Design a protein with these regions (language model features):
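An alpha-helical repeat/solenoid feature that recognizes helix-turn-helix modules
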Residues: 2-117, 133-169
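A structural feature that tracks compact, well-ordered secondary-structure segments
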Residues: 121-125
Length: 169
């Protein structure tokens, strides 16, 4: 929890390791994907085993994602953080999308109204049979392909249903 940043843009960047490396992740604005992946890892720690530092980091990560309404730019909520964040994929590897972020936040018990637009996005992508399509894929980069892009996805459907259940219950 020591190095993950949750700022929304700073004038004076931190220096030293690891900030002097990977400038794309440690530039003036915290890396959205880095925040999401840190939250994803910390959410797996059972609540009773989380240290105060872990809980503080989780709270900062949640707050960071909420000021961005999950998939928007905090300084202009009419713009997406990244266009790919509204195309649902599995597995995501280092990438992320609004569905993954919602899954992490709802797993952590968060159901803030600033999540609603992203939840509505999930609902809007459900087909008439209650399924969701695979819209983004790393197929061709693995030893085997995971489902077929553009077709209904068991994994996206499972994740979407879990998000909706956790958000509305």
């Amino acid at each position: 929890t020591k190095y993950q940043r949750f700022d929304d843009g700073v004038e004076h960047l931190p220096t030293g390791w690891p900030y002097d490396m990977a400038k794309s992740c440690f530039s003036k604005h915290s890396c959205h994907m880095g925040v999401v992946k840190a939250l994803k890892a910390l959410a797996e720690i059972p609540e009773e085993k989380r240290s105060n530092a872990v809980n503080d980091t989780i709270e900062k990560g949640i707050a960071y994602m909420l000021i961005h309404h999950i998939h928007k730019r905090s300084h202009d909520l009419n713009r997406l953080s990244k266009p790919g964040w509204i195309r649902f994929g599995f597995p995501l590897m280092y990438q992320t999308d609004a569905l993954e972020v919602l899954g992490i936040l709802t797993k952590l018990g968060c159901t803030d109204k600033r999540m609603q637009e992203a939840v509505d996005l999930v609902i809007s992508k459900q087909d008439d049979l209650g399924r969701w399509k695979l819209e983004s894929t790393f197929n061709g980069r693995f030893h085997t392909n995971i489902e077929q892009k553009g077709k209904p996805s068991k994994w996206i459907t499972l994740n979407a249903l879990k998000v909706l259940k956790n958000y509305y219950n």
